[in-house]
């Protein structure tokens, strides 16, 4: 079980990323647009620097949806590898069975 403060911090970051997503995308497009002038690129770069650090999606952490474990998370299921294995053995994941050869 992860610390509740770390789970809450990650949830708060998700909100901030969502809030600034459109503005961040517009600034990034201005940076890579070949038709924009050097002044426009400079303004876009400064605009990106003024955004909060937590507005970047890179700072988000994929966590287990049930207990918040930060590592070994399977994206397809949203749970950690440990929890996935337990749930699969108990038959709680439809369509998942242990392979044997």
Swiss-Prot record:
Family: Belongs to the universal ribosomal protein uS14 family.
MF terms (GO), sorted A to Z: rRNA binding; structural constituent of ribosome
One Pfam family hit: Ribosomal_S14
Protein origin, superkingdom: Bacteria
Keywords per UniProt: Ribonucleoprotein, Ribosomal protein, RNA-binding, rRNA-binding
One Gene Ontology term from the biological process aspect of the record: translation
InterPro entries, per database record: Ribosomal_uS14, Ribosomal_uS14_bac/plastid
Binding partners and assembly: Part of the 30S ribosomal subunit. Contacts proteins S3 and S10.
Protein name (Swiss-Prot/TrEMBL): Small ribosomal subunit protein uS14
Keyword hit for Transcription: no
Taxon lineage: Bacteria, Bacillati, Actinomycetota, Actinomycetes, Micrococcales
Cellular component, GO, one term: small ribosomal subunit
Protein role: Binds 16S rRNA, required for the assembly of 30S particles and may also be responsible for determining the conformation of the 16S rRNA at the A site.
């Amino acid at each position: 079980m992860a610390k509740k403060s770390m789970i809450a911090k990650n949830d708060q970051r998700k909100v901030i990323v969502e809030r600034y997503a459109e503005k961040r995308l517009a600034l990034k497009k201005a940076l890579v647009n070949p038709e924009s002038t050097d002044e426009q690129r400079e303004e876009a770069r400064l605009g990106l620097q003024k955004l909060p650090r937590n507005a970047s999606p890179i700072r988000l952490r994929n966590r287990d949806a049930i207990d918040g474990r930060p590592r070994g998370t399977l994206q397809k299921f949203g749970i950690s590898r440990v929890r996935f294995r337990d749930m699969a053995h108990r038959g709680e994941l439809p369509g998942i069975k242990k392979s044997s050869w």
